[in-house]
């Protein structure tokens, strides 16, 4: 029984130290850079400026956060 207790103690001590990331290893959330990487619907190759929607057969308009989007974009 003592061998099982020693093994359990070792596992409980080693697992959290190696499995959980440290604060320095976590990446920083940069929402401004994410916004620059997003392509606007006007620049999307499938966007039809005249219809303000994507090509034929697209179910338009859909709205997300007060912005009109297409189902294909």
Curated annotation (Swiss-Prot):
Subcellular location per the Swiss-Prot or TrEMBL entry: Secreted
Gene Ontology, cellular component aspect: extracellular region
Cystine bridges: 53-72, 54-70, 60-73
Source organism superkingdom: Eukaryota
First-listed, main subcellular location of the protein, grouped into a coarse class: secreted
Signal peptide start and end residues: 1-19
Tissues expressed in: Expressed by the venom duct.
Pro-piece positions: 20-51
Cited InterPro entries: Conotoxin (IPR004214)
Domain comment (free text): The cysteine framework is III (CC-C-C-CC). Classified in the M-1 branch, since 1 residue stands between the fourth and the fifth cysteine residues.
Family: Belongs to the conotoxin M superfamily.
Protein name as catalogued: Conotoxin CnIIIF
Source species: Conus consors (Singed cone)
């Amino acid at each position: 029984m003592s061998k099982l207790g020693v093994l359990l103690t070792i596992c409980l001590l080693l697992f959290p130290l190696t499995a959980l990331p440290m604060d320095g290893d976590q990446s920083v959330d940069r929402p401004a850079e994410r916004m620059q990487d997003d392509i606007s619907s006007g620049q999307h190759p499938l966007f039809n400026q005249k219809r303000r929607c994507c090509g034929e057969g697209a179910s338009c308009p859909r709205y997300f956060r007060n912005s009109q989007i297409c189902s294909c974009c």
